[in-house]
């Protein structure tokens, strides 16, 4: 019961944010179109700043001190490759392919991860989780942009796709973060404070906007795709990944990090990117909402079993 409450306490705030969005739309305080337009603020401003901040303050040297992070990076790449191979097999609509690929391989590790890690390990023992997120952010960002650009509605050349990947707002933020980190640049307070404040807005604002634009009828319409992605995202991918790390001899904090990186619900940025890149944002928003709800169950099951066998 304690583990169920722990998982619920992590996910519940995200669900409350979405409920606020639903109420804002239902009461007519904010129009659905305004909420869709407001996603551009997240896509072009707050989300890139959140990525920048995560990388700018990360201990990059520590990334290479343990083989765990190397295996984690390989796991992310393999998951993306398998998702890119699998999704086109059952989905023929380019407008949905990029969204489904992101749904399978990209987890909500930055928003969901630190909260879960702090609850399981304690506030003072989440160093590895922070470093893992700083490594996963650029990896997830690169492959997410590639997937979305690859299946964008218009026909474009490889060079055009590559240029869009390089100049994507999230990627530019990652470059800036690495630049500031490697050169040990300390921004003046007058710049750092607004960056921190805007980055902190990302999570609540993103989920409020998601709640205001999600269509509950879309759950029924996209039932097959949602079921497939939910099973893969919350159960199959983390089961395989965590099992692999256990076989490699990892225990404790490393297993918690692996569970979060590979088992968190669909990343909120999937919806934001779908809106910004003219993909199926209705499907993307529904995937984020449904997997966020069912992650309460999946995280409870994984945490319970791992604790029973003293793996964490």
Residue ranges and their predicted role:
Residues 1-312:
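Alpha-helical transmembrane segments of multi-pass small-molecule/ion transporters
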């Amino acid at each position: 019961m304690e583990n169920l409450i722990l998982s619920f306490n992590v996910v519940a705030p995200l669900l409350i944010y979405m409920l606020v969005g639903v109420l804002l739309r239902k009461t007519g305080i904010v129009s659905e179109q305004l909420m869709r337009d407001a996603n551009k603020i997240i896509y072009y401003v707050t989300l890139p700043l959140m990525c920048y901040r995560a990388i700018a303050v990360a201990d990059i040297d520590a990334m290479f001190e343990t083989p765990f992070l190397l295996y984690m990076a390989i796991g992310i790449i393999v998951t993306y490759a398998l998702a890119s191979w699998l999704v086109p097999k059952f989905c023929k609509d380019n407008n949905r392919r990029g969204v489904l690929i992101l749904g399978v391989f990209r987890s909500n590790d930055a928003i969901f991860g630190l909260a879960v890690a702090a609850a399981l390990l304690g506030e003072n023992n989440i160093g590895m989780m922070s470093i893992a997120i700083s490594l996963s952010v650029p990896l997830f960002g690169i492959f997410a942009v590639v997937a979305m650009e690859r299946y964008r509605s218009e026909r474009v050349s490889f060079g055009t796709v590559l240029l869009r990947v390089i100049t994507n707002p999230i990627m530019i933020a990652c470059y800036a973060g690495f630049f500031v980190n490697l050169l040990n640049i300390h921004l003046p307070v007058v710049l750092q404070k607004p960056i921190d404040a805007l980055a902190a807005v990302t999570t609540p604002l993103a989920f409020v906007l998601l709640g205001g634009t999600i269509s509950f009828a879309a759950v029924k319409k996209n039932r097959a795709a949602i079921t497939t992605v939910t099973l893969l995202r919350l159960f199959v991918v983390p089961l395989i990944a965590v099992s692999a790390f256990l076989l490699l001899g990892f225990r404790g904090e490393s297993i918690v990090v692996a569970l979060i990186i590979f088992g968190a619900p669909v990343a909120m940025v999937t919806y934001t990117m779908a809106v910004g890149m003219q993909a199926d944002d209705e499907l993307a928003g529904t995937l984020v909402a449904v997997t966020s709800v069912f992650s309460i169950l999946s995280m409870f099951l994984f945490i319970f079993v791992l604790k029973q066998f003293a793996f964490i």
